[in-house]
UniProtKB/Swiss-Prot annotation:
Keyword Repeat: no
Protein name per the record: Small ribosomal subunit protein uS8
Family: Belongs to the universal ribosomal protein uS8 family.
Gene designation: rpsH
Record bears the keyword RNA-binding: yes
Amino acid sequence: MAMTDPLGDMLTRIRNGQQAKKDSVLTPASTLRVRVLDVLQREGYIRGYSEEALGAKGQHKGIRIELKYFEGQPAIRHVARVSKPGRRVYSGSKELPIVRNGLGITIVSTPRGVLSDAEAREQNVGGEVLAEVF
């Protein structure tokens, strides 16, 4: 069966992995997923990620995401998909949502790449609001 929301699937794997206290989770690779992981790593929500070969012959690519914890608690307390395949959400740079009074981030896909809300405001660009994390 085809996956309708690959980014939502990755965010769910991260959420489930942290609830189960896993060190890392594995997800299929895609360019968008890598760009979102770059933002999460820059903002300090994950330790890092690496690309791996999957399958018996290594014909598929996967991403191993190294989860981060602080004093035994997950670094990501909440992660939610905002723009979904059935309902896209777009925002200008001035209207980007502020998550938890600035304690969290919004991940935005812009013409300049996938950025956090702070980076998008700084560069004065808007775009599709992909997810919110805190």
